[in-house]
UniProtKB/Swiss-Prot annotation:
PROSITE patterns: GATASE_TYPE_2 (PS51278), SIS (PS51464). One of its GO terms (biological process) is protein N-linked glycosylation. The gene is glmS. It holds the Pfam family GATase_6. This is Glutamine--fructose-6-phosphate aminotransferase [isomerizing].
Length: 624
């Protein structure tokens, strides 16, 4: 959630830090701050609201501070304390010598705060983070670690409970930063006579593409000349590849910029053909489906007798689509669970269970905890993820990466389509291993998937009328979405996008449930978006949804219908018809989702809202 950056080098730190904070705005935030170290002086500026507020404050900083070459930056998402200037990061000790930025939650902060207050420490904020600054300052000035900055930080880390990333600066040691992580992300960037730390590689992609992913309960000391990684006890005999992971970033700064588009989400919608194509690329070799990091043998896959899919938000909707494909192709029972609910209901898991964890960031806290619960129950766990080397893939038995590239817009678009493609690859891999599909059938299904990027591009190119339609309904108080079979998760996703971006009441329903309550909402002029199944699929399914459209139109609703090209049976009942190319039933969500993305973004723009940074939302949710 929060965005963190730290820099030590030769150039003015404020320039590097502020640029990094701008690139990490997509993570979501409600306040921001910066700390600069120069000549034994620590200068901090913090502001609630948009980053522009902090930029104004930085412009007024003393020139001596702006010449400093060591700095910290932070975009905060409030968990402890309201989003105000005083609660924004960085936080300092009472002497103003130690600064800290933090992502996560220090679970035992109340106990630590009482200890400090009893010792006479006065707090300047309501946050859990401030205790870390005071504890390090006290350790640095007294006891066994006096005058040892690194030792003081390590001593404090051993006392903290919870999930956290922390980065510390010390006015007395201006060329050094100390950073640490437990269960929340921290990446090290290796430059030429400069070093970076950040919540993700967007913090330093402009300056280097060489990075290191820190392991669990590890700390790193960085100077302009290099870095040293240790555990919280100070043991630095750690091995690259085993304990921490060096890697090369396979995208560049241009991928994280708008490239001439008005907003990132529009660019990312346009990138969906490439996202699907790249996710599929290289997964059919020698007549077989192959996964990325396949640490599960075909024999282990044959022994699977039940599948759980765990995810949150948009990824959960992709999981619902995975259920249709995996059950159809493998005849395995599939349950789809919200990751936040999964471990609390005591699911029945064993060695014959496959748990599929879907997460764009690979750091989603609820999904990570679901993975750990599944591992404790001896289930096999496979990750579907867009972030190479992140925490969830590292803890799983196998990985299937979506190759969507960086997604800056908070509301997921291209990663959703890439997740659908990855889910279908997994379904085919399971069918192949279990023998429920003949090799020629697997190959045919894969080649049908391969043809989808061109059709996705066709749909995107034809969404102009959808944007115009969105302006007509931008001031509606409610929009309903209906679907059946694979159209139901698409309806849920369409409603979620409208809620996220346009702050409108929107609900997605299984159309068969219409008479069981939702029909009471239908009134004159209410827009209802219907995702129509192909008439070439189940004739019964198509006929029933056609009947649903008649019912709502009779009651005065305005029907907006997404239907297959050539489906003339629906035309008389559609006040507005959006046509998509004809494809097989399971593949239709890759196309029918796109008009709903454009509709939501266009409504948001018509209402004057920021499409890329909707209020109260974060791209990567790293706390439960």
């Amino acid at each position: 959630m929060c965005g963190i950056v730290g820099y030590v080098g030769r150039r003015p730190a404020y320039v590097v830090v502020m640029d990094a904070l701008r690139r990490m705005e997509y993570r979501g935030y409600d306040s921001s701050g910066i700390a600069l170290v120069d000549g034994g002086t620590l200068t901090v500026r913090r502001r609630a609201g948009r980053l522009a507020n902090l930029e104004e404050a930085v412009a007024e900083m003393p020139s001596t501070a702006l010449s400093g070459t060591t700095g910290l930056g932070h975009t905060r998402w409030a968990t402890h304390g309201r989003p105000t200037d005083r609660n924004a990061h960085p936080h300092r000790d009472a002497a103003g010598k130690i600064a800290v930025v933090h992502n996560g939650i220090i679970e035992n902060f109340a106990v630590l705060r009482r200890e400090l207050e009893t010792a006479g420490v006065e707090f300047a904020s309501d946050t859990d983070t401030e205790v870390a600054a005071h504890l390090v300052a006290r350790a640095y000035r007294h006891g066994e670690t006096a005058d040892d900055f690194v030792g003081s930080v390590l001593a404090v880390l051993r006392r903290l409970e919870g999930h956290f990333t922390l980065v510390f600066a010390n006015a007395d040691d201006p060329g050094t930063l100390v950073a640490a992580r437990r269960s929340t992300p921290l990446v090290l960037g290796i430059g030429d006579n400069e070093m970076f730390v950040g919540s993700d590689v967007a913090a330093f992609i402009e300056h280097t593409r060489e990075a290191v992913e820190l392991g669990q309960d590890q700390a790193v000391v960085i100077t302009a000349d290099g870095y040293r990684i240790s555990d919280f006890d100070g043991n630095d005999g750690l091995q690259a590849g085993r304990d921490f992971r060096p890697f090369h970033i396979d995208w560049d700064l241009a991928a994280a910029e708008k490239g001439g588009y008005e907003y990132f989400m529009l660019k990312e919608i346009a990138e969906q053909p490439a996202a699907v194509a790249d996710t599929l690329l290289g997964h059919f070799v020698g007549g077989r489906i192959v996964l990325d990091e396949q640490r599960l043998s075909d024999q282990e896959l044959r022994e699977i007798d039940k599948v759980f899919v765990v995810a949150c938000g948009t990824a959960y909707h992709s999981g619902l689509l995975a259920k249709y494909a995996i059950e159809h192709w493998t005849r395995l029972p599939v349950e789809v669970e919200l990751a936040s609910e999964f471990r609390y209901r005591d699911p029945v898991l064993d060695r014959s269970t496959l748990v599929v964890a879907i997460s764009q960031s690979g750091e989603t806290a609820d999904t990570l905890e679901a993975v750990r619960h599944a591992k404790e129950q001896k289930a096999k766990v496979l990750a579907i993820c867009n972030t190479n080397g992140s925490q969830i893939p590292r803890e799983c038995d196998a990985v299937l990466y979506t190759r969507a590239g960086p997604e800056i817009g908070v509301a997921s678009t291209k990663t959703f389509l890439a997740q659908i493609a990855a889910n279908y690859l997994l379904g085919l891999a399971l069918a192949q291993a279990r023998g429920t599909k003949y090799p020629d059938e697997v190959e045919r299904e894969y080649h049908e998937l391969e043809a989808m990027p061109d059709l996705v591009a066709r749909v995107i190119a034809a969404t102009g009328p959808v944007a115009e339609l969105a302006h007509r309904f931008a001031q509606s108080s409610t929009v309903l979405f209906l679907g059946r079979h694979v159209g139901y998760p698409v309806a849920l996703e369409g409603a979620l996008k409208l809620k996220e971006l346009a702050y409108m009441h929107a609900e997605g329903f299984a159309a068969g449930e219409l008479k069981h309550g939702p029909i009471a909402l239908i009134e004159d002029g209410l827009p209802v978006i219907v995702v129509m199944p192909s008439p070439k699929g189940s004739a019964t399914l198509h006929a029933k949804l056609l009947s649903n459209i008649r019912e709502i139109q009779t009651r005065g609703a305005v029907t907006i219908v997404i239907a297959e090209e050539g489906d003339e049976t629906v035309r008389p009942y559609a006040d507005h018809l959006i046509e998509i190319p004809a494809v097989s039933t399971l593949l239709q969500p890759l196309l029918s989702t796109i008009p709903l993305q454009v509709f939501a973004a266009s409504v948001a723009r018509a209402r004057g809202y920021d499409v890329d940074k909707p209020r109260n939302l974060a791209k990567s949710v790293t706390v439960e």
